[in-house]
Swiss-Prot record:
Protein name as catalogued: Large ribosomal subunit protein uL2
Purpose: One of the primary rRNA binding proteins. Required for association of the 30S and 50S subunits to form the 70S ribosome, for tRNA binding and peptide bond formation. It has been suggested to have peptidyltransferase activity; this is somewhat controversial. Makes several contacts with the 16S rRNA in the 70S ribosome.
A single MF term (Gene Ontology): structural constituent of ribosome
Cellular component GO terms held in the UniProt record: large ribosomal subunit
Species annotation: Mycoplasma pneumoniae (strain ATCC 29342 / M129 / Subtype 1)
Quaternary structure, from the entry: Part of the 50S ribosomal subunit. Forms a bridge to the 30S subunit in the 70S ribosome.
Phosphoprotein among keywords: no
Stretch list, region Disordered: 222-266
Gene3D superfamilies per UniProt: 2.30.30.30, Nucleic acid-binding proteins (2.40.50.140), Ribosomal protein L2, domain 3 (4.10.950.10)
Keywords per UniProt: Ribonucleoprotein, Ribosomal protein, RNA-binding, rRNA-binding
Cross-referenced SMART domains: Ribosomal_L2, Ribosomal_L2_C
Amino acid sequence: MPIKKIISRSNSGIHHSTVIDYKKLLTTNKNKPEKSLLVTLKKHGGRNNQGKITVRHQGGRNKRKYRIIDFKRTHYDNIEATVKSIEYDPNRSCFVSLITYANGAKSYIISPDGIKVGDKILASEHPIDIKPGFSMPLAFIPEGTQVHNIELHPKGGGQIARSAGSYARILGQDETGKYVILQLLSGETRKFLKECRATVGVVSNLDHNLVVIGKAGRNRHRGIRPTVRGSAMNPNDHPHGGGEGRSPVGRDAPRTPWGKRHMGVKTRNMKKASTNLIIRNRKGEQY
């Protein structure tokens, strides 16, 4: 199992921490990614161009370089590619695979579980083999197949099931033959246009959810700052703030920092066009 416990008794946080043993999973030195596919990332600390906080709990992370990931897989259709390496990516929970096409082009893709260096993969708009890493339209993938990196719109690039260990299962086509029905890992059942592409297999790094962070410093290294309770703030900072001592919320329901109803209250706009594509939500309720 690639989860490794940190053997140290210097403090209680480290004593209970676990990490992923990347030496068993990766095939290349993490300090040597493909330079032609790297972009420098500027840190914003959750601030906008006015210096105001727009995303809370961000700031102070380690420096990163962004790996340009090919989510579309349409640039080199029907050209066989070879997996050259499986690498760590600090910008996502899964691993990425560096592939080289027969014409010499290189690109990064989300690494499926079970793929190895030297494996051949292919992307096509026509029916091809059902193997991990092969990309094709949903119309050509049989029922029961696990897929990831699923497009919401044809040729728009994969947007669904891209994080570690995630996938969706194909349930079949609808009665019109225009859509393919997928069950997402959240439990939601949804329709996708059959022209949308998906990649066969489950996303790599299945044990990501088993990692125990253990101490605050590891999250600070990742750029995650502390989360403060609203009831501990002043009334001008949060709807729950103020009062003498530990005061109750004082409202009919808990609120977000922006005054919106929170915890168990449905906030989805049912007039969105995509509502018609959802068959059952993640709670199993019929739409």
